Amino acid sequence: YDSMGRVIEESNKDFGTKLYEYDKAGNLKKYTDGNGNATVSKFDSLGQVLQSKDAVGNITKYEYDALGNETKITYGDGSSHSKEYDNCGRLAKETDELGAVTTYTYDAADNLVSKSDDSGRTWTYTYDNTGNRLSETNPEGGTTTYTYDKAGNLVSSTDEEGRTDTYAYDKAGNLTTSKDALGYT
């Protein structure tokens, strides 16, 4: 760790040594993986990444709107991924590097209620009065449901095939146990 408490080196017998370098503002300006491959990033005065250059020289550029929302990523091969936001600053539409479009709609409480792709597939979501997601329905009609305790902690999720994962918490709300449908913790 450095004097600011940030990780500067991680060593692992399987993955080698990873190195982290930060700029004066605390942004991760250089990351070197265990194989010695480095990614170097440049940031604006707000700490938003403007570009990153990988170990083979590919440059990825990032653009933002006046509110700081990421609006476009342009990859080294010239392809791009763009995002558009509604008047509330919520992601409304994104177009991936292959031209596929996904649109998003929200309720008055800013909860995502649907996501649709350009092939007509739609995912829908429901919530309780506190904003906890109660269900998620995929385009094929399969639904996953969620339950919560009085503190708002997720206690179970049950998928469309009836498989249930459960979660337990201590009095402080810290997750103490997570068990999947097969009983693995």
Task: Indicate residue ranges for each PLM-predicted region.
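Beta-strand elements of repeat-based all-beta scaffolds
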Residues: 1-12, 16-33, 37-54, 58-75, ...
